[in-house]
Amino acid sequence: MPETHQNTLTWKGTRLPAGEACNGCRERKRRCVRRKRELPCLSCQAENRPCDVSRYRRRRRRRRGPNKRNCKSLRVLGGQSAEPFNMHQQPDTDSCSEIQHGIETDECGSQCRIPSQSPGPYPEPQPAASTYSLCLPSYVTGVPKHLALVTLNALREKGAFTLPPAEIQTYLISSYIMHVHPDMPFLDLERLLEAVILRCRGRQTSMLLLQAVMFAGSIFLDPVYLHLMGYTSRRAAMRDLFGRAKLLYECGFEVQPTYKLQSLLLFTLFHEDDLAGSSFWMGEAWNLAKTIGLQYDLQEVPVDESSSELAFRRRLWWCVYTRDRLLALSTRSAMHISDGDYNVPMLALADFKSCFGTAEAYRALQLDSDLRTDGTKTALALTFIYKTKLSQLIGRVLMSQYTIGSASPTTMLYYPRPTPISLSDFLGMENDLDVWETSLPSLLEFPLPLLSPVSQAEKIIYAQRAMLHMIYLTCINALHRPWSSSAQPTSSDPWEGAFRDLSAWKIEYASQAILMIATHLHSIGLTNFLADTAVPSLLSAMITHIVRLNSDILVAPEANAVCFVQGWECLQGLREKYEWARHAAAFIRFTTRSLRTG
């Protein structure tokens, strides 16, 4: 064995990789291995050639830093350098003053614009939302990471991130609490008010949900404040505020399903879109509720959720269920939820603890302290609980007395069955409605007290009681109308004809009672508290009176005419807020004109 190889074997394990290669190894592109600070290396020693090292080092590739154009885009107005903004970090102030990657805002943090940049020869790739930070108020959650910059810019340009001034937000939220929240108490008002009104550090809400709340509050807000916002009419304000929330939903800005579900329930209050009406948004809400398993009782499975979270889920579920039933009763649209799809227990008073705001938040909203009394909370909670129980009966009535038919290629509506149900089934459902009415507590009984309400709490409770009885009377009308109008007997029972006459009388009684309630609310200035489901109730009652006035047999024609006129005045008062009221008024006007000319 040559000596060189013996040396190689002897040196094996003591050699180290060279920090700099010799000229021979560099030319042959070999690895240069030698002792520290000693020559020759192993390769040169084995080949018996000179080994020398020149002072040449491989230069490290310098990292590419930000170019001047990007550095300029990172600066805000005033020449100060913008620090990286963490979208999940809570700012110290209520509004931001700078945005990363060239987006800037004003003091309110709602209007954003992009600084001018010199265009390059090639379009730059759009970064994802993970490298983009939109400046939003501190009380709303940050920008999701999955949205592209072009999507966020489009949302910003269309005003999806624009919020009303703080004072107008206060009035909008107050309007929501007084008119919408008692009808659908799915919001955790304590968290919402702590974030938006009190600006508590660490409290945030969803931008999508906040925009939806702004839209719902604009339905009942005083027109003076709508004009201060720059809108010429309530319809324009509702359309604009709804459009902002709809853009955020369609672009997937919100990722938390509960916020999306709450917003979808508020979307059902918008009726002007023919393609995406209340029934469409209700279907979206039901699909999302199934996705998160809202229809299941989590008490039957071991979960790590607190009692307040379980109460919130129950309230949210029954709001979805009740809204589905009331929309089916009002618009004849097909129900999305079947009675066998859920096993959530009925609500209790303990489930409503977190749906009321704190006293400090109510004072900031200039709301009466009576809204936080135990009596007010109990009355509003019981009203919704009994409305939920009535909604279960509404589903049974619609499934038994009506069948689904196609009104158009994209619309399915309820129509009376060609053959009514048997007399025993009919009497069973009527008995269930009577049991529901007799089980009402004293503070929800009918008729309403004659004394007009004075405080805000009394007005809200009074209006909610009135709406509850209007829904009950509308359900009676829906139960008896197919039975009284059917010409085919279902059995040979001699009492069947008498029950048909009784059904006709109950329809007339229910219609007259609906108009009396609406007239009384109109006389004391509470028409503004009526929900959208009051419009179909008024329409069915007025149609009954039109038929009665046009019949040959008239009982108290003057009283019928007075009820009709008063119902018409109440319907006119709802035209500004609801598209349904405008269509109903046009239908009544066309019907009366046709009867006069015919």
From Swiss-Prot:
The GO terms this record gives for MF are: DNA binding; DNA-binding transcription factor activity, RNA polymerase II-specific; zinc ion binding
Species this chain originates from: Aspergillus oryzae
Arranged from A to Z, the UniProt key words for this protein are: DNA-binding, Metal-binding, Nucleus, Transcription, Transcription regulation, Zinc
**Is Nucleotide-binding found in the keyword set?**
no
Q: What happens when the gene is disrupted?
A: Has no significant effect on the synthesis of 2-oxocyclopiazonic acid, cyclopiazonic acid (CPA) and their biosynthetic intermediates.
**Which named protein is this?**
Transcription factor cpaR
Question: Domain of life here?
Answer: Eukaryota
Q: What is the lineage of its organism?
A: Eukaryota, Fungi, Dikarya, Ascomycota, Pezizomycotina
Q: What SMART domains is this protein classified in?
A: Fungal_trans
